Amino acid sequence: MTYHWNWHLFLEQVQSGDETYLQWMVSGLGWTLAVALSAWFIALVLGSLIGTLRTAPKRWLSVPATAWVELFRNIPVLVQLFLRFFVVPELLPPKLSLWVKQDMPSKEFITAALALGLFTSARIAEQVRAGIQSLPRGQSYAALALGFTRTQAYRYVILPMA
């Protein structure tokens, strides 16, 4: 193999401006990290909430949370990205649709962060649900026997151990 890499290509200017290819790559890395961190935050908050709701004894809380997980885990992430970017704006009311379709500077960023965050929230919800259900039932019974409400039992006993 006698191929020699031309690493100086990264220091050359792009044809459309004064930037170099290396500056483009560093900028792309920054946007990638920003999307990843935003999606991580969305996924962690929503996933923890939905995972907790999936273990709630009231069906009006657990059924929508289960539907959320089933919806977002069973649609591939690439399909969700396309749906959020191209289909959802068409389904919104006219004024809101017009606002979403206008040329915003960070429309792609918001769409990607939301789609990845919502997709990953379903996986985190499953992990939280599994963690809660792995605890012995005696833990929640003991909390309720001590006079805790169901919310207090989750907050002070179940979730810290899950």
Locations of regions flagged by a protein language model:
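Transmembrane alpha-helices and adjacent helix-loop boundaries
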Residues: 1-162
